[in-house]
Amino acid sequence: MSSGKIVQIIGAVVDAEFPRESLPKIYDALRVDEVGLVLEVQQQLGDGVVRCIAMGSTDGVRRGVTVTNTGAPISVPVGTETLGRIMNVLGDPIDEKGPIGEKERWGIHRKAPSYQDQAAANELLETGIKVIDLICPFAKGGKVGLFGGAGVGKTVNMMELIRNIAIEHSGYSVFAGVGERTREGNDFYHEMKESNVLDKVSLVYGQMNEPPGNRLRVALTGLTIAEKFRDEGRDVLLFIDNIYRYTLAGTEVSALLGRMPSAVGYQPNLAEEMGILQERITSTKTGSITSIQAVYVPADDLTDPSPATTFAHLDATVVLSRQIAELGIYPAVDPLDSTSRQLDPLVIGHEHYETTRRVQSTLQRYKELRDIIAILGMDELSENDKLIVSRARKIQRFLSQPFFVAEVFTGSPGKYVPLKDTIAGFKGIVDGDYDDVPEQAFYMVGSIDEALEKAKRLAA
């Protein structure tokens, strides 16, 4: 193990000088034992000097301090010992429960599985959330993105999916909190504990208050733990909240390293950085990784380079809309903007496919008629259009659903709706079976039977 000296410190960027014959490689981890800091090599500047990003605060670090090259990238604990534990980017426990006691450590920089090792995902994953199961069904071993601006419910949707899938699914889950609020991480830990699923979840946190190096690498730490479970032949769930903060940390690091910014100030290698992470999140013939990623959309602009780069890698996109949230319809999923590769009659069956397309065309027609209604009123519409508007408003309300994780705030118990009940309910609405039922009966209920019961109560 070679050692060198620190020659310059500018915030999170540290330059270290090594003997020329033992220059550290890119991504090698360097240790500053005096302050217990780890650095990751990002650039070789020549003349034996390497430029590093600090994986922690550089307070107390000064010029001339000795740095040791570990000769390998950052490595983290993997395996079942990580379950029920909270770790940071370096794999150190931060839950005050003592050492992890791992039998194996893996480097966080790994190659993506080769083409011949990868497996296609066609098996449906039921979530119990009507709008998702109907409009943008998830595949087991697929990649899903939850897109939304500030405060439209990405994290709540993510928590509900974790609750529904992780509790119903008996496999292991990994949660990577990338640059999100510490409070949310704390709430999530306690929620898992109360649901008795903590012993099946590994938690990796690099929250908002951490230096950019931690936030950039914490997603790779979580992914490495998930890859180990996958390579043991398991079906793993990987939750990442939030991919945008991963991009943002990359932007900060890129600026600190002096790279020229590209569009909207993002790093010039945005697509490559996103690809490095996303290409590793994949299923192999041994096991599967089903990943659900929250993606913050800056200023509600889906064409921003960060969300736009993420779209290309996903199998299903769930777009949360502020307009729908303003109507009080939660989950605020936009049924006309959300898509899934699984939406194919050969995968989901003809009944599901036909129902989804009819629901979407009804909502699309309602969207077109809204301007006419706003100017001329409902009376100017043809009888057929009036019927479409009435059904579309019922569909819109029936797409809402009370969540288990929001019980504390709403006071109404959460609902898990099986896929067959979801299809039957929406098919009935578009077929006109419930034309005589008032639209408010469809709001915030589970299955169609609950809507009919609510209608009876409203009529009484």
UniProtKB/Swiss-Prot annotation:
Keywords for this protein: ATP synthesis, ATP-binding, Cell inner membrane, Cell membrane, CF(1), Hydrogen ion transport, Ion transport, Membrane, Nucleotide-binding, Translocase, Transport
The protein's matches in CDD domains, at most eight in alphabetical order, are given as: ATP-synt_F1_beta_C, ATP-synt_F1_beta_N, F1-ATPase_beta_CD
Please state where this protein is localized.
Answer: Cell inner membrane
The entry's ATP-binding residues are G148, G149, A150, G151, V152, G153, K154, T155
EC number per UniProt:
7.1.2.2
Write down the membrane topology.
Peripheral membrane protein
Provide one Gene Ontology cellular component. plasma membrane
**Where is the major localization of this protein?**
membrane
One GO molecular function term of this record is: ATP hydrolysis activity
Catalyses: ATP + H2O + 4 H(+)(in) = ADP + phosphate + 5 H(+)(out)
Name the Gene3D superfamilies on file. 2.40.10.170, Bovine Mitochondrial F1-atpase, Atp Synthase Beta Chain, Chain D, domain 3, P-loop containing nucleotide triphosphate hydrolases
Which InterPro entries has this protein been placed in? AAA+_ATPase, ATP-synt_VA_C, ATP_synth_F1_bsu, ATPase_a/bsu_AS, ATPase_alpha/beta_chains, ATPase_F1/V1/A1_a/bsu_N, ATPase_F1/V1/A1_a/bsu_N_sf, ATPase_F1/V1/A1_a/bsu_nucl-bd
Q: Name one Pfam family in it.
A: ATP-synt_VA_C
Q: Write down the NCBIfam families for this protein, in alphabetical order.
A: atpD (TIGR01039)
Cite the record's note on assembly.
Answer: F-type ATPases have 2 components, CF(1) - the catalytic core - and CF(0) - the membrane proton channel. CF(1) has five subunits: alpha(3), beta(3), gamma(1), delta(1), epsilon(1). CF(0) has three main subunits: a(1), b(2) and c(9-12). The alpha and beta chains form an alternating ring which encloses part of the gamma chain. CF(1) is attached to CF(0) by a central stalk formed by the gamma and epsilon chains, while a peripheral stalk is formed by the delta and b chains.
Q: What does the UniProt record say this protein does?
A: Produces ATP from ADP in the presence of a proton gradient across the membrane. The catalytic sites are hosted primarily by the beta subunits.
Entry similarity comment: Belongs to the ATPase alpha/beta chains family.
What is this protein's record name?
Answer: ATP synthase subunit beta
In its UniProt entry, the species of origin is given as: Methylococcus capsulatus (strain ATCC 33009 / NCIMB 11132 / Bath)
Lineage, broadest ranks = Bacteria, Pseudomonadati, Pseudomonadota, Gammaproteobacteria, Methylococcales
Q: Which gene encodes it?
A: atpD
